[in-house]
């Protein structure tokens, strides 16, 4: 018997972790995390269900890992803008441009995975929920920093910093919901510009 033709035994073929994470992320992002199962990921990638469980331990583990990738791809660039030391009006312009970028050109879905997960927080596992809350706290902290910096430039309306930070964070959330609903980026940009005028008074003439 030709031993080269014998079926392989021992440890299973190594799972492509990056493929699994990318596929899971895009499915969660485009369809919603509650509408995608591990079976769906298996069919999409050709991976075995036991293999995915060995790698990620659970559906919760897979979602948490995908969420970390999402932060790197879609959240960290926003944080970098908000923490930049450029003039505040430029920070606002860049923030609006980032939020309303053409997703088709970048090959990513419309909307925000964080917003979708937050709406389903009661259905999330403990580790995914913990990661979600951490990322949301990071976004709030970045807006808080941006507001504090604007005060140093005398470009702030006078609202309490924490209130303004929550307001701006929720403008971001609202913009993502509008985008998911198919509202044009041009319209969303106008809404955001109007909202930012309410907070950053000094820069209101930048958006006329």
Regions flagged by a language model, labelled:
Residues 102-105, 149, 168-186, 198-207:
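Amphipathic C-terminal alpha-helical segment
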Residues 124-126, 136-164, 199-207:
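Hydrophobic alpha-helical bundle segments that form small-molecule/ligand-binding pockets
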Residues 91, 105-127:
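Amphipathic alpha-helical segments used for helix-helix packing
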Residues 1-15, 203-208:
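N-terminal intrinsically disordered/low-complexity leader segments
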Residues 110, 115, 119, 158-178, ...:
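Hydrophobic alpha-helical segments that form the core
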Residues 2-8, 19, 23, 27-61, ...:
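Helix-turn-helix
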Residues 15-26, 30, 44, 61-84, ...:
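Alpha-helical structural segments
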Residues 31-34, 110, 153:
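Short coil/turn segments at alpha/beta junctions that flank glycine-rich nucleotide-binding fingerprints
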